Design a protein with these regions (language model features):
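Conserved acidic segment of CheY-like receiver
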Residues: 5-17, 22-23, 35
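Short hydrophobic/Thr-rich beta-strand motif most characteristic of the beta2 strand and flanking loop
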Residues: 30-38, 45
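Conserved phosphotransfer microenvironments
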Residues: 55-70
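Short, conserved "switch-loop" micro-motifs in signal-transduction and mechanochemical regulators
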Residues: 87-88
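C-terminal output helix
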Residues: 91, 109-119, 130-131
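CheY-like receiver
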Residues: 118, 125-140
Length: 140
């Protein structure tokens, strides 16, 4: 559980079932969770709401581009962005981190790894998480 509550977490994923489950997980610790389902809503929400953290599915955009991440970084340079994905290949992780992600969490381990990743990026810490490092990567 975080030391101080977040005012807002922005959750972006096209898959409604997953977002509902993640919202429940995040609300147990953080309170307000705003859900969006597309790139335009992510950019609008990030700019308008100024959330503390954004948890975003790597495949949010229909194409396999990380342009949304670069756009979020331009609009909200201090926003902590955690990318979630079904892909766990090192090349995918590296691409997300190089595009500006603060952390990367594999979806198959999201129930155990998301909250520790949020806490790590919130604290500005880098390096390995307390969970399996194969599942969570934090920007160094």
């Amino acid at each position: 559980m975080p030391e101080k509550p977040l005012s807002c977490v922005l959750l972006a994923d096209r898959h409604h079932g997953l977002t509902e489950g993640l919202r429940g997980l995040l609300q147990t610790a953080f309170g307000t969770v705003v859900m969006v389902a597309d790139e335009a809503s992510l950019l609008d929400g990030a700019g308008r709401l100024q959330p503390d953290v954004a948890v975003v599915d790597l495949s949010l955009a229909r194409e396999s581009s990380l342009g949304w991440l670069r756009a979020v970084r331009q609009r909200c340079p201090n926003l902590k962005v955690i990318v979630i994905s079904v892909h766990d290949e090192q090349s995918v992780r590296r691409a997300a981190m190089e595009a500006g992600a603060d952390a990367f969490v594999v979806k198959r381990a999201i129930a155990t790894d998301l909250l520790p990743a949020v806490e790590l990026v919130r604290g500005g810490r880098s390096g390995g998480a307390s969970t399996d490092e194969a599942e969570v990567e934090i920007e160094n």
